[in-house]
């Protein structure tokens, strides 16, 4: 609800000072692999034997909520509660924890508790949320590892709402904490509140959702501080859509959130001290120390506006809409100099946060007035105004979606307050309703699949396309559900719709003819298993690829097609694919690393998968780029051997992004390649990995490592399985 909109706008968010120059300083264009090694076990103080879900199951949630409810009205002298209630502060904390989520790549959100780390803990829009986290510390300290910070942020927001008379939709635990900042692209700007992310007619760059560096959503004063409600509505619609909210959900969230609390702009924002990451050691991670008055309470400065929306800011009500429509609004400025709106011809009716004897005039933000003056938002707002119960239900559902959107399927939800109702945005999959196939069935089905006339490339590419939609960021996608046969995935260019239809038709026929029920989702993955075992055997290595049945097939009615559109790859370096119809905002090799990170792969896993998929002939469109073998369909290490040989000289071809590998002696073209292929020979770290697999004694290691990485991708969305290392079993 609060936001900094004009103070310190030119300050660089990167700390400066004498420091040794690293590789990125010398070679800024060097491909960065560090995102593949985030969440390292070595950074986790709890160790590999700690399982958060098991700890959460021992939590006394009722007692925890009672403690949180008591905290809401236990005002502290070092940061007094507005209106004697911390509800508005904790709603904002939870909202801003979840509100970084973006649909384009599924990153951000509340799932990892990243708000306590840089840069989020120091974003202008998160000013003074450090105080909310410190207020929570005694409770976190009391309950220890039974509740993660990530879960506690969301739960505190829920309890805040409930303590002020609102009935929430539910709460699910299960967000395990991370222990270091995630390396994530938040924008190209080098200053807080910069907006270089726009081009043309205010076209917001992908994958970003917020309008300016350091904001969660939009500038509350209007686009770039311009108090234009209609312009603000355009920004709101764009940025809320990018975090998976439609118009109705957007109105419900803004109006519902702004039913409570206030913004803080009591004085000159230039009197604020540095953000937490910019403070001195004695500040102990508390930022934004203010020299204005007492620095807190009635003198608090969080951002520019000083707005109170409701006559009862610690109680669920319809006052927001009542004020929005009852009054005409006049542009004014806050004590901090920010643009905001005050009710015309009104009597003071909203309470002062610290002096019960005082009343103020109702006030609104430019982004609030967008809900009245945008014709689409106005229609929804008026309906909610006239139907308070409908508004309450819409806000409850939208709040639940906001705070749970990046948790993935309901199978990951924990606790007694998980809603019984299944929601479409949760990507529901039917429960297993049949006896699963056994080992003998698996072998029989593999034989039938290999005898169906489908090639190794057909089976591998179909299984890969089905499973590789998985995003570890928001736990969406994956092979479970077999949504590759449904709209929109069945029509994606990368999936080669005609070939896909043929493969699926044959697999479905095999399933129908088999004596036991088996899902198409399982058959798709099993087809890949059978193909890889055959390809490895043809390379002289006997291996049994792990397979775990238990996937089910989702229906089209269980699939929100528009919400799956962002999962369509702009590029898939694993299959040497670039979608020419989509804007590419990364180099091909950067897109490969980005996709590998979403698949939760390490650099070695990414390397071995690319090398294996190339020789298996799994390229999109049957492209020959990077197929450095004379035996396609055989799981050999030829890709690495032929890439690293000095017998080949590489040079650009006449086609952009395509390279020719010529025999150094004859000049004959032997291979063609993309940037994704050649990066494994040009990048020193990737070359070191490629060398491992090109060595003469790595024949079996290559196959085993490929199978392990492949199985990891196939099972990425199997939250019903216990996460254990993939153990390879030699075939008989």
Curated annotation (Swiss-Prot):
Residue ranges under compositional bias (Basic and acidic residues)? Answer: 1-10
Top enzyme category: oxidoreductase
Region: Disordered; residue ranges are 1-26
For this chain, the annotated S-S bridges are: none
Q: What is the lineage of its organism?
A: Bacteria, Pseudomonadati, Pseudomonadota, Alphaproteobacteria, Hyphomicrobiales
Q: Where is this site: Transition state stabilizer?
A: 92
Pfam families assigned:
peroxidase (PF00141)
The cofactor remark states:
Binds 1 heme b (iron(II)-protoporphyrin IX) group per dimer.
The residues the record assigns to binding heme b are 258
PTM annotation: Formation of the three residue Trp-Tyr-Met cross-link is important for the catalase, but not the peroxidase activity of the enzyme.
Name the record gives this protein = Catalase-peroxidase
Listed HAMAP family: Catal_peroxid
Q: Name one GO biological process term.
A: cellular response to hydrogen peroxide
Q: Where do we see the Tryptophyl-tyrosyl-methioninium (Trp-Tyr) (with M-243) cross-link in this protein?
A: 95-217
Cross-linked residues for Tryptophyl-tyrosyl-methioninium (Tyr-Met) (with W-95) are 217-243
Role summary: Bifunctional enzyme with both catalase and broad-spectrum peroxidase activity.
- Show the Gene3D superfamilies listed in the entry: 1.10.520.10, Peroxidase, domain 2
Top-rank taxon of the source lineage equals Bacteria
State the species of origin. Rhodopseudomonas palustris (strain BisB18)
User: Which of UniProt's keywords are assigned here?
Assistant: Heme, Hydrogen peroxide, Iron, Metal-binding, Oxidoreductase, Peroxidase
- Please report which protein family the annotation says this sequence is part of: Belongs to the peroxidase family. Peroxidase/catalase subfamily.
Task: Please give the cofactor(s) recorded in the UniProt entry for this protein.
Answer: heme b
| Chemical reaction(s) catalysed | H2O2 + AH2 = A + 2 H2O; 2 H2O2 = O2 + 2 H2O
Q: Where is the active site?
A: 96 (proton acceptor)
